[in-house]
Structure formats: structure tokens, C-alpha cells
Curated annotation (Swiss-Prot):
Keywords: ATP-binding, Carbohydrate metabolism, Cytoplasm, Galactose metabolism, Kinase, Magnesium, Metal-binding, Nucleotide-binding, Transferase. The gene is galK. Belongs to the GHMP kinase family. GalK subfamily. SUPFAM superfamilies: GHMP Kinase, C-terminal domain, Ribosomal protein S5 domain 2-like. Catalyzes the transfer of the gamma-phosphate of ATP to D-galactose to form alpha-D-galactose-1-phosphate (Gal-1-P). The record marks 28 as: Transition state stabilizer. The lineage of its organism: Bacteria, Bacillati, Chloroflexota, Chloroflexia, Chloroflexales. It is found in: Cytoplasm. It catalyses: alpha-D-galactose + ATP = alpha-D-galactose 1-phosphate + ADP + H(+). Pathway: Carbohydrate metabolism; galactose metabolism. One of its GO terms (biological process) is galactose metabolic process. It comes from Roseiflexus castenholzii (strain DSM 13941 / HLO8). This is Galactokinase.
Amino acid sequence: MLDTGTLRARFQQHYGIHPSVIVRAPGRVNLIGEHTDYNDGFVFPVAIDRATYVAARLRHDQLVRVASSDLNEEDTFAIDQIERSNRPWHNYIRGVALALRVAGHPLLGADLLIASDVPRGAGLSSSAALEVAVGYAFQVLNNLNILGEELALLAQGAENNFVGVQCGIMDQLIAVLGRADHALLIDCRDLSYRAVPLPPSVAVVICDSHIPRTLAASAYNQRRQECDMAVQLLRRWYPGIRALRDVSEDHLAAHSDALPEPIRSRARHVVRENRRTLQGAEALERGDVVTFGRLMNESHASLRDDYQVSLPDIDILVETAHHLAGCYGSRLTGAGFGGCTVSLVERNEVESFSRDLLRVYHNATGRTATIYVCRASDGVGRATDNAGPQE
């Protein structure tokens, strides 16, 4: 957790005045339900206790000034003349401001200072945390009445339409709606959700492989296209389907010969992953961590074999975790081709689990991974810890 008192001091040093508000939006890790969100399916993420913070103060002109404490970079743009920048991180902020204006929300300019302890490039949704935090800062500064789901959709729209990344809704939605000590089962079609408590005896352990995700963007778009192609082919027999969410395992079995590879395997992963996600949420609701862990393991096998988004070194992390004491289940999380694994581990075994996982991975690959032991946190809101009086 970042110290908000330090953020206030940095803001004052940079802008010569205290911020009027500091907000935070968390990163996320998805326990199960991978590559299902853009297929109108089900996901089961938690908001983690690492977040992006925005210290902000309203201006009374059209100017937005942004300083990144982490990158030591700045951006300035006019709120009524928003254009794309050649600096990618600028566009997340500009895109959110534009999305708010297009939706009819009047904005004044602002001074913003951004800092984050969400690891970038690890698949923990640092970009969604940034979008949601900036959107919420604009909301607070301008006294806007925006429901949580609307803020998530606006942030997703900014990433889709302005940044140019065709992400699903999960990352932004959990950044808005996350609940401490709970995972959220989210229906990505109608955005309905229910909170499921996490057993207090179990820890969420994230392991960053530090494998650069150089193929993630192109492969992600390719997988989306393959899923869309599966839907188009299956509409010959099931004209009412809108997405793979509407396809059952029986549908696939009846017409698998009509789906060429790799489209058949992609569809099989999504359809079965939706089932696993629903079963997993039900298992945790009744406190059955063993069943949930087994479903996590099945999910990884499907991501590896059917969706083909894992890598050998990621498989080493997962297989090693499976054999360590206290681990109920482990899998790749995020888009794939690097990034992180997530494991559910008995809390009193976390220290030895982490030590042994890092050792085996380093011996096998030569890489040094990073462990994050996370707690499920609340979604976006004001950050008041150590902030002092907010003016």
C-alpha cells in the first residue's frame, strides 16, 4: 500500500498546492474464468491490495496536467480538444476524459499526480486500475453522479476505442466493484455479480514469472477472432446464439466435426471454462477449497492445451505449485504468454510454498520470479490512509 501522505507531499512539491482528493483503484487477479469475458461468459476475479493512486485537484480552466510519479513523466492536454498521444500511458488518461465527455458528463480541467504499486506488464490489470482511478478522480472533482457499472463501461470504452486494446469488461468491473475478502462471480453479458467470501485460512499467492509478454497482444486478438469464427459456424445449427456463452458442451459434441482446428479447441476451452467458473464459485460458497483447486488445475490444462496461451516456463511454475505442501490449485492468470500464475495456498504454508516455488523455478529456468501474497480488497474509492486533511 502506498503512503498517501507521501503522495500529498509529492503533489504539493510538483504543483505548489495540496490535492483536494486522493483516490485509489485496485489491480486484480482472476481466480478462474480465463478468456471468457469477451465471450459474454463468467469470470471470478478478486481485487488485490495493490492499487493505482491519483492525487487530484480541480482547475477552473480546460487544462489537464498529469504527472506520473513512477515514470517521472508528464502530460498536458486540453479537456475540450483531446487527441491521441504517441506516449501510450498518456492515452489511458486522455481516453477516460474523452469517454466521460462523450457520455455527456461536463468536465473542468485538473491537476493529477499518479502513482501505483500494481506491477506493470504482469497481467494484473495495471491499465484498468489507472483508467478507473482517473475516471473516479474526475467524477469526484466534478461532482458527477456515475454508477459503478457505468464507470467500468466508460473505462473499458476508453481502452477499446482510444487506446486501441480490445479488452473485455472484467478488469474495469472488478476495479470498481471489488469487495474486501471476497471474490466476485461476474456475468460479463449483463454485468450482474455476486460476492463469494474467501476462506480466511487460504491465501491468494501470485507469482510473476518475469517473462516478457511480447506475444500477448497479437495472440489475444487472434483468439478473439477464432472464438467469433466458432460462433459463426455454429449458428448454422443454433441461429440464436450470440457468443460462446450460449454454446453448451452438448452443442460442441454434436457438431465438433464442423469446427476445424484450432477453432474447435478454442471453443472447447471457453465452453468448459464457463462451467468450471460456475462450479468453482459454488464450491467456494460451501467452503470446498479442494474442489475449487481441482478446477483451477483443470483450467490451466485447458489454457495450455486447448487455448494454447501458456509457455513451458509458466507450466513449470504451475506444475511445481501443484506438488508443494498447502497448495490447493494453481494456474496461469491473465491473457497468457508470460505474466503471472495464481495459487490458492493454506495460509500457514505460504512462506515455505513461496520459498520452494522460487527456488525450483530459478533452478529450472534461470529466472528470478516475484511473489505477491495478496488479500482481496475493496474496489475504487477515496484513499484516506495517512492523507491528512484534504482541502
